[in-house]
Amino acid sequence: MKPTMAILERISKNSQENIDEVFTRLYRYLLRPDIYYVAYQNLYSNKGASTKGILDDTADGFSEEKIKKIIQSLKDGTYYPQPVRRMYIAKKNSKKMRPLGIPTFTDKLIQEAVRIILESIYEPVFEDVSHGFRPQRSCHTALKTIKREFGGARWFVEGDIKGCFDNIDHVTLIGLINLKIKDMKMSQLIYKFLKAGYLENWQYHKTYSGTPQGGILSPLLANIYLHELDKFVLQLKMKFDRESPERITPEYRELHNEIKRISHRLKKLEGEEKAKVLLEYQEKRKRLPTLPCTSQTNKVLKYVRYADDFIISVKGSKEDCQWIKEQLKLFIHNKLKMELSEEKTLITHSSQPARFLGYDIRVRRSGTIKRSGKVKKRTLNGSVELLIPLQDKIRQFIFDKKIAIQKKDSSWFPVHRKYLIRSTDLEIITIYNSELRGICNYYGLASNFNQLNYFAYLMEYSCLKTIASKHKGTLSKTISMFKDGSGSWGIPYEIKQGKQRRYFANFSECKSPYQFTDEISQAPVLYGYARNTLENRLKAKCCELCGTSDENTSYEIHHVNKVKNLKGKEKWEMAMIAKQRKTLVVCFHCHRHVIHKHK
């Protein structure tokens, strides 16, 4: 039998070559065992693999028998998803809480298999303007597109859809899926997931709209839904754009022609007269903008979306932006059955920062000349600048994490973090390094990146003060205690290979080592099949703990969330530490009576 992933690769190529193709009989791929090994491989390394839904069902205990039960329930129509367990997490920069729906692991497994199938069909047809929850795309690819394509914009329209994920209309979504997939069983299964409901305080609630945030399928279903918005905005762009290289302002053309005339004169002159004309030439070159000044009749619309956040740049008037906003409002209400937030959908002049994906975005308006070595360089007037919102995002991070306090003169004073004192020295420095590197990596595209240097200083001294407070010592004694003689400091620790030292992250090395280019990979997503090691290990029918290799014995996967949390006291813990794996294939007896003997 041909591997399912090889079939999906062919389906993906067909979808790419013919975007109007309609696909049928997809449900049968959910009745093949191999897709569940791939799904498990994708899921088990995630933190949520050990998070329980409403049942005691996690990545632990996965087996061939479990796959057979899943396939049988899908085949005879007896499978119904369990309600998700609702929990709440704090929203960033808000006192409001965001609801998350945690499915059971069996439901996650089936959702992941469905996601793999749907992605092979939809990924090739999604528009390039969409960057959220897609292979080879990220926040950075969205921001790089903005930097590359939004140059010369006069206005920004910052889009916000009210409660997007919570208000996706189920009937509309299934209708959109049915346009591309003619498979009643697959549509019914997706509809079952949407209507599964949720448990909160052990009370069942029905779901009438929305996709549960936390579900495996939710991001892809949201992209399928908002793909209609992408298509609409691109159609709007075709109507709106009125770009012509001839529409250069008379003032720009006159200055440009004058510079050309002086340039021709320079070739014929010598001595003092040439020096005098050269000075005049340089003065006029300074006044010439890097980008041609175009008249207001030159109209261009650009658009980028990441999940439910989108931004539009407009070369045109404010009235044009208001017209675009009204068109969006009507489409989102009539077609998507959702509402564009009037208060949060802002029209911002490009000289002022527009907020998108945690960055401030604005268009440079400066003819300033900068010197780089012996060469004079003009700044790119009209180019896009990405900035870190230091007084907003970074300031809020410092407050939230209690890294520093602000004094009366507005300067910052680093302080210790009380809630970290019970952690080990190694854990404390690891937390600080992780936070610092995370922020530096995310804001690596910003032109004011070096201003994070002060933030790095606050992080370092907050870390030192936290360790000093833990040991009830002074800051200077703590620095002396952990210095290595070269001026750097770090926490010593020991592993099997010998003594090691974890240094505090050096700011100059915190930025991602990968070159930030303006190119987005256009390589197709391959779904080629290669039997994964986990499938091989299960099918080998050999217990990796006791060595049993009985064909008639049931074998399961024992799963842990983090290998580093294992103490190494039990035989199975030593086996997992030695293999440095989160999974161990064991026989039924070992799993129930050796590993889970105390449960």
Swiss-Prot record:
Tagged with keyword Glycoprotein: no
Region of interest called Intron maturase type-2, as start-end residue ranges on this chain: 381-549
Occurrences of domain Reverse transcriptase (ranges): 70-361
Any one GO molecular-function label of the UniProt entry: RNA-directed DNA polymerase activity
Swiss-Prot/TrEMBL catalytic activity: DNA(n) + a 2'-deoxyribonucleoside 5'-triphosphate = DNA(n+1) + diphosphate
Annotated InterPro entries: AI2M-like_HNH, DNA/RNA_pol_sf, Domain_X, GrpII_Intron_Splice-Mob/Def, RT_dom
Biotechnology: Mobile group II introns can be retargeted and used for highly specific chromosomal gene disruption in bacteria. Could be useful for genetic engineering and functional genomics in a wide variety of bacteria.
Names of the cofactor(s): Mg(2+)
Note: The correct folding of LtrA seems to be facilitated by binding to the unspliced precursor or intron RNA. RNA would serve in part as a chaperone that promotes folding of the protein into an active conformation. Purified protein lacks endonuclease activity unless complexed with intron lariat RNA. It may preferentially function in cis by binding to the intron RNA from which it was translated.
Biological function: Multifunctional protein that promotes group II intron splicing and mobility by acting both on RNA and DNA. It has three activities: reverse transcriptase (RT) for intron duplication, maturase to promote splicing, and DNA endonuclease for site-specific cleavage of recipient alleles. The intron-encoded protein promotes splicing by facilitating the formation of the catalytically active structure of the intron RNA. After splicing, the protein remains bound to the excised intron lariat RNA, forming ribonucleoprotein particles, and cleaving the antisense strand of the recipient DNA in the 3' exon.
Family statement drawn from the similarity comment of this UniProt entry: In the N-terminal section; belongs to the bacterial reverse transcriptase family.
Name assigned to this protein: Group II intron-encoded protein LtrA
Organism: Lactococcus lactis subsp. cremoris
